């Protein structure tokens, strides 16, 4: 019971960290503190006159913006708190005889790597491949925490439900397609391409003749003093944005098909309805981002919607792939 409650708290806290990370990134505060783990050579944001003078001498090329610096440091503080929660979960799993052992250890290693990605995000000046990897690390972390939570709960029998037993492959494909779409979303955001297209449904103008696929999806974009606000030209950013929109159409179609097929199951009908509801919300948020020119609250909510969709699909896959006769734990 203690482990279950700790996992619930940690799941909510992880979602908070993801949303705070999105808020920091979308507020252009990713380099609010140009060093790591401190901020302008201090543990906290420098505010006193002597601290500001020292900070300016260390980073003469940076304009100190306390609001952005505090956003970045708050994100680091709560991420550190999440790390402590994950360590507590690992220790509890080690002490609990029938709890999984390898999965919590992997989660600990993942959050350590996530911390390294957070450092590289700053030291590599918001290099898009690092920023996207950091975003994916957060989504992977919350997904694995949910999986651990599901495995510590009493087992539910779903495999015997013949009406949905053959849907496991479709659910798995849907999960991987959604992950691909989340990657495209992260690539769009990290390359500052969210407003490259302002018309619906695909893009304005003769976009098909102006695609720049090679430039748009090159993981390494050369040497630059900073990648803040993006370094790609308009055509490359437009290509990224279009790929994300087309990916959204494919993903939405597949998830709707999965939800329709799951609706016949008495055990998974609620998850089917939740999936449809979250999908409608996510598409609405995506359209609102375009029409309203990326308002901060809606853009952050779009990140949160992606996380909730991912958690829903992880849960669906767990129940569909779980064999009730299996008693082994990793």
From Swiss-Prot:
Q: Where are the transmembrane segments?
A: 3-23, 77-97, 103-123, 129-149, 167-187, 246-266, 271-291, 296-316
Q: In which pathway does it act?
A: Porphyrin-containing compound metabolism; heme A biosynthesis; heme A from heme O: step 1/1
Which Enzyme Commission number(s) are on file for it? 1.17.99.9
Q: Name one GO molecular function term.
A: metal ion binding
* Localization (cell): Cell inner membrane
Write down the chemical reaction(s) this protein catalyses.
Fe(II)-heme o + 2 A + H2O = Fe(II)-heme a + 2 AH2
User: What's the main place this protein lives?
Assistant: membrane
Q: Which residues bind heme o?
A: 75, 134
Periplasmic compartment segments: 24-76, 124-128, 188-245, 292-295
Phenotype when changing residue 72 to D: Partially reduces catalytic activity
Subunit structure and binding partners: Interacts with CtaB.
The cross-references to PANTHER family, in alphabetical order and at most eight, read: HEME A SYNTHASE
Its name, as the record gives it, is Heme A synthase
